[in-house]
Swiss-Prot record:
Zn(2+) binds at residues 300, 351, 476. InterPro entries: aa-tRNA-synt_IIb, aa-tRNA-synth_II, aa-tRNA-synth_II/BPL/LPL, Anticodon-bd, Anticodon-bd_dom_sf, Thr-tRNA-ligase_IIa, Thr/Ala-tRNA-synth_IIc_edit, ThrRS_anticodon. Catalyzes the attachment of threonine to tRNA(Thr) in a two-step reaction: L-threonine is first activated by ATP to form Thr-AMP and then transferred to the acceptor end of tRNA(Thr). Also edits incorrectly charged L-seryl-tRNA(Thr). This is Threonine--tRNA ligase. Gene3D superfamilies: 3.30.54.20, Anticodon-binding domain, Bira Bifunctional Protein, Domain 2, Threonyl-trna Synthetase, Chain A, domain 2. Its cofactor is Zn(2+). It comes from Campylobacter jejuni subsp. jejuni serotype O:23/36 (strain 81-176). One of its GO terms (molecular function) is threonine-tRNA ligase activity. One of its GO terms (cellular component) is cytosol. CDD domains: ThrRS_anticodon, ThrRS_core. Homodimer. It is an enzyme of class 6 (ligase). Binds 1 zinc ion per subunit. GO terms for biological process: threonyl-tRNA aminoacylation.
Length: 602
């Protein structure tokens, strides 16, 4: 069957067929390519809006963009719409798709658009946010809406879609404005791809770290404490502690020095750094003795002050500081999401002060660090360089030097990378580390950032080999990004079945009766001396119930102890990952767990 053209590609810009005048452009076919899905999903957002308007004539619409894996639309409606209403909206969408309605585009001036939609306050909001000039409107049947496009030429291309959830969304993301209704959905070019995606979504629900965090007693949140402020329970704290200790050892082996800066700094320091002018809305401030202070959103200023605490020579460089730095950032309530988006979190943060000639060497060393750690947790990953944003400090030449150094390091390693134009932090370009989990979802975690600007702002110096004062380069570096986010991702990646070496409880010990508890506690103590946490299930319950409780906690290993095991000083082992049961002497078991702990290579 011949493929149908759904749009065209002009360099990196997708142009729908309604707008094409130059037929020499590259054709985008109706399939599951990135470009085609953008057109299909954008069009499906309008199809959904058309269906909603048909079912709820009073509905007014704000914006309906394409997002990763789908689309959404924000709108106002008098009726309360819940998950149960998605079925009838989908049914109406299918009717409209089967009607094969032509989708057309026309343009008017902004002033004409303001007049056309004068009785629609949400359209007025949209129009006030866009520049003067021509405004494009897409029309299908009786429905039309403001949109830049691109869109499919006909609703017949919109057959394989699914509305996934209903949520609330503040108008324009402003918590002080009204709450609109938001419906999310996704769409594909064929039934099989949609089915595969929905299967992944169902699996993701089972793996949701918020659900598993509760079931495995890792962490909790409390409204009296406040949103975005996780409380770590014993299991979660053990998991996190093991991760922290492992990373501490890796850092020390790689030449990093542990440091710790204050969490509260005078606003003067944030003014020098540029955070006050460029990042203030994301920070928390307070007054102490009529002096303004800011809680740190990043650790860099503290590390700069540690660098300045002594005279530095070229012989000292590179100087590597690392800290598990607790930071706070003001996040709107609507974007908070489990451990993925919080207001307080701990970064595995490091800053490397080096000479310009050492940049590439240090970036290469960081990339090796990243590779070792990601392989340890069975993550694949990719890199993306983020370049100078619109709001930035430092001149273009400095940015160019820094960006070039990052590209050269990645090229030397033969690593593929993308470019996120304008996605850098305000003080320097960066490499974003994006990991892929077991469900093939991509997550942005760590960063590597070259910074010439902060050393200049704080007048950092070192003495070179000619006894002259020079300015060092500063590399910002986080591998995990934050412990909270990484643990959330890891929990979903392994469905709560953590690797033995960081499992909060690695071994469940199940004594069959009271006579076997002493032996169970003896084993527990021996394991603890090896830094392996275990739990003895000593309640007066049936053996099957004890084992079931341990299995629900997804423990890597379960030991069952009865008369025979006590007499022979042995264990009946159930290995969850190997999916096997066997009897071992206690010495053999201890040797086995030592081997599992030694499998962690740095």
């Amino acid at each position: 069957m011949e493929k149908e053209v759904i749009a065209y590609l002009d360099n990196e810009t997708i142009i729908d067929s309604q707008s094409v005048k130059n037929t020499n452009l590259k054709e985008i076919y109706f399939d599951n390519s990135k470009e085609s899905l953008e057109v299909i999903r954008h069009s499906c957002a309008h199809l959904m809006a058309q269906a909603i308007k048909s079912l709820y004539p009073e509905a007014k619409f704000f914006v309906g963009p394409v997002i990763e894996d789908g689309f959404y639309y924000d709108f106002r409606v008098e009726s309360k719409i819940g998950e149960e209403d998605l079925v009838k909206i989908e049914k109406k969408m299918k009717e409209l798709a089967e009607a094969k309605i032509e989708i057309s585009k026309y343009e008017i001036t902004k002033s004409e658009a303001l007049a056309k939609f004068q009785n629609d306050d949400l359209k007025q909001e949209v129009l006030l946010r866009i520049p003067d000039g021509a405004v494009s409107i897409y029309k299908q049947g009786e429905f039309e809406d403001l949109c830049r496009g691109p869109h499919a030429p006909n609703t017949k291309f919109l057959r394989f879609f699914k509305l996934t959830r209903v949520a609330g969304a503040y108008l324009g993301g402003d918590e002080k404005r009204e709450m609109l209704t938001r419906i999310y959905g996704t769409a594909f070019a064929d039934k099989e791809s949609l089915k595969e995606y929905l299967t992944i979504i169902e699996e993701a629900k089972k793996r949701d770290h918020r659900k598993l965090g509760t079931e495995l007693k890792l962490f909790t949140f409390d409204d009296e404490i406040g949103g975005g402020l996780p409380i770590w329970l014993s299991n979660g704290a053990r998991l996190r502690s093991k991760l922290e200790h492992m990373l501490y050892k890796i850092h020390r082996l790689r030449g990093y020095e542990p440091v710790r800066g204050p969490e509260l700094l005078k606003a003067d320091a944030w003014k020098i750094s540029g955070h006050y002018a460029n990042y203030k809305e994301n920070m928390y401030f307070t007054q102490i003795d009529e002096q303004e202070y800011g809680i740190k959103p990043m650790n860099c200023v503290g590390h700069i002050k540690i660098y300045q605490s002594d005279v530095r020579s070229y012989r000292d460089l590179p100087l590597k500081f690392f800290e598990y730095g607790v930071v706070h950032r003001h996040e709107k309530s609507g974007v908070l999401h489990g451990l993925f988006r919080v207001r307080e979190f701990t970064q595995d943060d490091a800053h490397i002060f080096c000479m310009p000639s050492q940049i590439k060497e240090q970036v290469l060393e960081i990339l090796a660090f990243v590779d070792n750690l990601m392989k340890l947790f069975d993550f694949s990953y990719e890199m993306e360089i983020s370049t100078k944003p619109e709001k930035a400090i430092g001149d273009d030449e400095i940015w160019e030097i820094a960006t070039k150094a990052l590209k050269e390091a990645l090229n030397e390693q033969g690593l593929k990378y993308g470019i996120d134009e304008g996605g850098g932090a305000f003080y320097g370009p960066k490499i974003d580390i994006k990991i892929t989990d077991a469900l093939k979802r991509k997550w942005q975690c760590g960063t590597v950032q070259v910074d010439f600007n902060l050393p200049s702002r704080f007048k950092l110096e070192y003495t070179d080999s000619d006894n002259e004062k020079k300015q060092p380069v500063m590399l910002h570096r986080a591998i995990l990004g934050s412990f909270e986010r990484f643990i959330g991702i890891l929990t979903e990646h392994c469905a709560g079945e953590f690797p033995f070496f960081i499992a909060p409880t690695a071994v469940g010990i199940v004594p069959i009766g009271e006579a076997h508890i002493a032996y169970a506690k003896e084993i527990q103590k021996e394991l603890l001396e090896l830094n392996i946490d275990s739990e003895v299930y000593e309640k007066n319950e049936s053996l099957s119930k004890k084992i079931r409780i341990a299995e629900k906690q997804k423990l890597p290993m379960i030991l069952v102890l009865g008369d025979d095991e006590v007499v022979k000083r042995s264990v009946a082992l159930r290995d969850r990952r190997a999916k096997e049961q066997k009897n071992l002497s206690l010495d053999e078991f201890i040797k086995l767990v030592k081997e599992k702990m030694s499998e962690v290579h740095f």
